[in-house]
Amino acid sequence: MDRISQLSDDLLLQILSFIPGKDVVATSLLSKRWQSLWMLVSELEYDDSYHTGDYKSFSQFVYRSLLSNNAPVIKHLHLNLGPDCPAIDIGLWIGFALTRRLRQLKINIRTSSNDASFSLPSSLYTSDTLETLRLINFVLLDVPSSVCLPSLKVLHLKTVDYEDDASLPSLLFGCPNLEELFVERHDQDLEMDVTFVVPSLRRLSMIDKNYGQCDRYVIDVPSLKYLNITDDAVYDVRQIENMPELVEAHVDITQGVTHKFLRALTSVRQLSLCLSLSEVMCPSGIIFSQLVHLNLSTVVKGWWDLLTSMLQDSPKLQSLKLIDKQHESGLCGIETPIGWKLPSSVPECLLFSLEAFEWIGYKGRRGDREVATYVLKNAACLRTAKFSPESTDVGEKYHMLKELASVPTASTSSKLLFD
């Protein structure tokens, strides 16, 4: 303890910021110096799942801790609460933190005793200091008519509830400097028909698992650099109006992809796709002139035709990775049909730029061998070809390796790697 006490106050406060609030307060018993030091901690976390007594004692502890806090600014407040926590207490705790120029707020209401979600205090929607807001589970986004969050740059909404489909656009309209938005929906009852324009947004992640729900999104994000969309909603409709600055995109969509949607991705340098070409209505004429890295999932029907199209339309492609995500999705990679439609001529990227080819979950079936053989025979600049088979059988893996090693390669310097 003597060594720790020799550390500076700033360093000790930084250490205290990493431990739960209950333990922070307990340090006041160590010495006179610690009696006042814990009151200056600016990053506060309260989690009732660690509390062993009744809820009343937990509530009193939080009130006492907040009222004793003398930090000039509360940088971070994290509330992880269960069904016993009254909404009035949560609102008062958040309101107090806002008066101390709160910078970051994270609220996770794990479950609700009466299936009612917690509504945020109206003062939160007009905070001029809040920079990060993360809301999780039983939180209701009941947005007032006036929203002004000039400092908010990061907004995460994970499986929260919405008062109506105007809630999200209204909130975004009041965030003129928002840079990162994460939205995740799971089986929410409310159908969303959302149009939002966020000129400042640079990162957008949307995960929608509303199976059978008919949601519609129209997105205008001219400054976007990063896009991640995972969508299992069968009848979902999405439209992206403007993404000229996009650099990286990850798209995993069940249905509803349009030609216009793919055209909005043509500026990317890194692209991950899990979709069927039949969903895109044959995207001829779309050139991915900046694309360098392409990841393609093999768990959707027609992935081989999408591969053909992407090879033809990505003249600068340097890295190609085929991924069987069976372990993640529970789906098995679909075998390439015998005699799949080859490119009409050897794609430019195979002749002049492709340097790395990788196949994760390679099964060695006849159709799969055709795809692998085509790439190996035509990729003149290939440096590495790496195959990670799904099988753990040594004999089967050896047979796959022997087949691949017998393929004549266009590149004299390529290395065949086999995990």
Swiss-Prot record:
Query: Which InterPro entries does this chain map to?
Result: F-box-like_dom_sf, F-box_AtFBL13-like, F-box_dom, FBD, FBL13/AtMIF1-like, LRR_dom_sf, LRR_FXL15/At3g58940/PEG3-like
Alphabetically ordered keywords of this record: Leucine-rich repeat, Repeat
Location of the F-box domain: 1-53
CDD domains documented for this protein: F-box_AtFBL13-like
Question: SUPFAM superfamilies, from UniProt?
Answer: F-box domain, RNI-like
Where's the FBD domain? 339-389
Question: Which is one Pfam family of this protein?
Answer: LRR_At5g56370
Q: Which residues form a coiled coil?
A: none
Swiss-Prot/TrEMBL LRR repeat ranges: 55-81, 132-159, 160-185, 187-208, 226-253, 254-284, 299-324
Protein name (database record): F-box/FBD/LRR-repeat protein At4g26340
